[in-house]
């Protein structure tokens, strides 16, 4: 019985070390300031963003916000992450979790890199961890990231 308990604990601990990551990027023919303005105008998300359909709350470091996402071919999901980093024109990140830390956590990050030639590399990534991460299929979420990136690119380059 003791051996089974120890094996179970070891198994659960190994699952917490598992992680998955999605990373997408695109080069946009616009300055970081222009892209940041679009990216942080959350009230406009329903009009252009096919993946993150809503962000409410004050987006400042350590604040809790409410985010609605709609991965392709999936139902809408709502979660309440904490803002980790907000550096104007450069980076925005948050940490979301399922019920409590360690079950299923996601650290989402948007990064803007000024290429010095009038273009910006936009990187969107998320690192997933926790004991339930092995159940998560990243395919639809990555597709949603790419769709959002493309719409952001189109909007920034057309206005």
Give the residues covered by each predicted segment:
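A conserved amphipathic terminal alpha-helix motif
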Residues: 104, 109, 121-159
């Amino acid at each position: 019985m003791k051996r089974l308990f120890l094996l179970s604990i070891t198994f659960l601990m190994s699952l917490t070390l598992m992680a998955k990551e999605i990373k997408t990027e695109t080069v946009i023919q616009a300055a970081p300031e222009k892209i940041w303005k679009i990216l942080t105008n959350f009230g406009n998300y329903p009009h252009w963003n096919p993946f993150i359909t809503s962000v409410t709350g004050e987006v400042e470091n350590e604040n809790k916000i409410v985010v609605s996402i709609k991965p392709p071919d999936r139902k809408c999901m709502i979660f309440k992450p904490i803002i980790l980093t907000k550096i104007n024109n450069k980076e925005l990140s948050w940490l979301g979790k399922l019920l409590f830390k360690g079950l299923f956590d996601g650290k989402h990050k948007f990064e803007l890199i000024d290429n010095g030639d009038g273009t910006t590399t936009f990187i969107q990534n998320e690192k997933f961890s926790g004991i339930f991460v092995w159940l998560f299929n990243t395919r639809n979420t990555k597709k949603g990231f790419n769709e959002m990136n493309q719409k952001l690119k189109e909007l920034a380059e057309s206005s």
